[in-house]
Amino acid sequence: MTTLLDPSSRSLVFAVFSVFVVICLMLCVVTGADEDDRALVRSDSRRLRSWQQGIAMGGDTTTVATVTVLVGMVATSGFDGLGVMLGSLIGVVLLLVLVVEPLRGHASLTAADVLDARGSGGPAVRVSWGVVTLFVCFPLLVVQLVVVGNVAAALIGQPGARTGCIVVIGCVMTALAVSGGIRGTGVVMIAKSAIALPVLVVAAVLVLHRFGGDLGRLLDAAAHGSGRGEAYLRPGGYTGEGWVGAVNRIGQTCGMAMATLAMPAVLMRAIATKSPRGARTVGRWMLGELTLLYGALAVVGVGAAALVGEALREAGPAAQVFTPLLLGRALDSGGLLVAALACVLFLTALAAVVDVTLAAGIALGRDVLGASGTTGGTASRWSAALTGTVSAVVAVAVADWNLVVVSTLWLAVCGAALAPVLLYALYWPGFTARGALWCLWGATVLSVAALALSPYASGAPGSILPGHDFRIWDVTIPGLVTVPAGFLLGWLGSVTDPRRAAGGRAGSGAEQGTGDRLNGPRAAHR
């Protein structure tokens, strides 16, 4: 696993990637926003159309971890990997039905502005939302940088180059986020989708062609290649058996759906949607793109189990990140497909990190630091630069950790803390600032505690501290507990708020006029 490409293919990959980075940087500079805070965050309706917004939002939900980890999970675990994809698609549907249209066209710049407009905000809620958003964005950024650093080092054939790869790629991606704003990063996201989706579809077609288009043959070969036999087609390969497996599977689907609904980068683009018709166009393009993408990833994952399953078992869990590249080498010994798939991984990481860095920078600059106007634009850019730099440093420090732990952390916090607050603010008139604070902080602490006391933290070979054992339960995906707890905390904090009992919402009535635009889809047609 030290090298995946011959020298000629390696040169092709980095030549193509370098050209694409230069083009993306130029596009970000040309199409990016000026120093105005609103231009930095919101998309100019004449420069980014609804179908483009839909493609960009679909790209926001597709990180490099999605491509590598999901394909690896399908290859090694079968049914459970497909369950993760199902949870993500459910989250996209919920996002389009419940969130995009109520948010569209509002004067807000961030989701914290929505809470203010609904009367459930305030300075404490704004800062808390910003801090929890950063808590979600940092692990997500770290995962992307570590994955792409590992892949780059393997392609070079020098594992010791991983640190340098993480730092260089982190700097490039931070520069793109700072220079482009949401419009410029949208162009990068669209360009990534235009390249990644066709390559993955071609890989899926080649897999099907290898087995004569017979799905039965493909599944039989995958079951044999995975080493699990018929168990490959049943749940439990990743989530476990018995009641623990059931809790993990339900929590996996529930947590993935809620986290997809509330991803900060996705909300940033949802706010910029222009009209009900534009929201529907965004939804069609986003759902179509992701359905095609996940279908291709599922076929690629099953194909990897069939063709390189033995190599994956011998290499261990750490090799899952290289699954698409190993499959490419098995399908095309000439190296062209490996080169194309490597470019897809680089470009997916590039686009994801750029957008998440921008979302984190805006959360820090506007929500936490409270900057606005021209000052806000400058503060958000400097915050994005700081976020990218810190993420690269942290990625280097935790590069040897189990990345599934880091991924589960941001998914758990996003699904249990951000999603309930957003949905309550949009659809429950009785939601108050106290409820928002209880949900944001309570669900975040509960999510961290649930993972800290699980086998991900200690007591297992792949845990962060394998030499210690302070786990109190065997559940590794706590969504079944944390997501309902987040909703419960938001409800309990609101109904026990003395200011609500006194006859008003805890935010203030000053913004009731603007709140009507956020009362949900029905308000738009009154």
Ranges and model annotations:
Residues 1-526:
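Membrane-embedded helix-loop-helix hairpins and adjacent transmembrane boundary segments
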